[in-house]
Amino acid sequence: MSSEQTEVLVVGGGQAGIAMSEHLSSHGVPHLVVERDRVAERWRTWRWDSLVANGPAWHDRFPGMEFDCAPDAFAAKDDVADYLVAYAEKIDAPVRTGVEVTAVRRNDARPGFHIETSAG
């Protein structure tokens, strides 16, 4: 089983996980994002086909990147997923897909946590 250290581990490569990665990177904080599926998978397969974002594209965008649709349009679920993937690539988010967190334990020897994943 491999062992690795990081300052911050972000669990989940969805909207919040990718946003957190951008903020951590902009502040120079070393981190890793782990996602059990692919980035934004819940937007693709766990939503109704008719679902759209709950705000217009100009409101729901991340800093520095527009949606492909009109600013006043409500992006469809697959467009949101594609946007999140493209944003993660744009910011070079350190995402590892196919990695599921299986256990989290406080580290008694020093500050922090010991995380077990499907990858070790």
Place the predicted regions along the sequence by residue.
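Short polybasic/polar patches that bind polyanions
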Residues: S25, P63, E89
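Glycine-rich active-site loop/strand segments that organize a redox cofactor
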Residues: E41-A81
